[in-house]
């Protein structure tokens, strides 16, 4: 057992860029432990992840704002404060804020994350229709 109080001591917010579109900040909740990574992630309006998937899965818990999540081959779905999403192993997806609002979620990623290409603007904007 390990108790981690608050945020990781000495950890600073990290601006994410290489696998995100737009302004995204992440704050680690705990260091990666036994293949589990937990981050609080803040997305400015229009910001989103690249397409990606997780070896074992991911849980998203939206703590503020609203946004979209999209599983490959499906229409984007609205997610908002209080929503929880389970993304299964190998499910290719993206998630982020919508065009008008910020979104903050706690992301618990289990196993390796495989990052892929950016989400095209026309695919992202399908959610706004």
Where are these regions (language model features)?
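Short beta-strand His + acidic residue motifs that chelate non-heme Fe in jelly-roll/DSBH
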Residues: 49-51, 69-70, 92-99
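Glycine- and acidic-residue-biased ligand/ion/polar-headgroup-sensing regions
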Residues: 55-67, 72-73
